[in-house]
Amino acid sequence: MALLDSATLEFVRSHADEDVRRLAFLADRFPGVDMPAALDQIRGRQVAKVKIPAWAAVDGIVYPPHLSLEQCSGEAAARYKARLVRRLGVQSMVDLTGGMGVDFSWMAREVGQATYVERQEWLCALAKENFPRLGLSHVEVRQGEAEALLPALPVVDFIYLDPARRDSKGGKTYAISDCVPDVSQLKEELLRHARWILVKLSPMLDWHAAVEAMRCGLGGVCEVHVVSSGNECKELLLLLSADAPVAPRLYCVNDDVCFSCDTRCAFPPLVYGVPRVGDMLLVPNASVMKAGCFTAFASRFRLRAIAPNSHLFFIPAEEASGDGFATGMPARCFRLVAVTSFNKKALRQALAGVSRANVAVRNFPLTAAELRKRLRLGDGGDVFIFATTTSERQHVLLVCRKLPDAGKIHENQP
């Protein structure tokens, strides 16, 4: 891959925050500039400012085309993997699917010996250009296929893989066996080269099925990490080891909040009820929802559920020690200001003075849009309405206000 010449680099620096669509029409005015390459870099840096701001802050980073940026991890997810590497006490590592190198760049900072492997030559060239600028002078870059290079690689503490999830036609794939490389087939060879294997998979996968796919032969999954950012599920991570237990430990991560549980435990059944005014309503975050560990979640925080399929929980006012009780909770937390049936008089009283609201439905016969129209409410504002069905099959509206977020590591987070 040809790196940028000085004229193109200067153009990129001078126009870093401008609209690339407008800049594309200026090519004739800058004959000495490689305009397609310049636009790729400007667009790449603009994406990086949002997705990987620490990279965007470093002058001279060379960015790949849009698809590689789309597929790479965000900074929050990369930092999480680095914390995991630190917790495991890793001293040496290999990334067998280096790609743009975002995950590698954070994990490599935690170890004394790190090797980046990538099958595409141009991405290796980018890595060799970028890693020194990121302060990674102790890393090695190797070009080649993971399966071909693996037998010749030294034994290390930790191997990381982010298998390609696109088929030969560019379409997205999700199943482990459809990804390249197929980690389920490589697992035993990988575990002969490392104590720990971390695999990044699509958040669309069911984690139970992913664990089952890794169960045959030597080793298996010892930890499952469901990673979200901004309450949007981004990644499913499987940590494999040769001595994995029968059932893995589950980590549900959203930004700086982590909830974990042992999937071998039998938790008490959910206790159902209807909340009252003043109670705290909790909506599990995206990672808990994806993991489906509702009985563990409710048991840990002594929560009641509204119904089996609502995934709405509450804490009686007398058991919640003020708004600070929500600190570090793996959920969005609300204070109930009204609980009402669909009786017209009750609705008028509950919604008095409310002209706009954020409306959501859970286990309810109407869509949010249909309900908002029926209630004659605009969208938005600081009032939240959850329409749901109780365990006794009664339709209720829960009118509430959101409690302040207090992002904080709650427990056991790497």
PLM regions: where:
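SAM-dependent transferase fold signal centered on methyltransferase-like domains
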Residues: 1-414
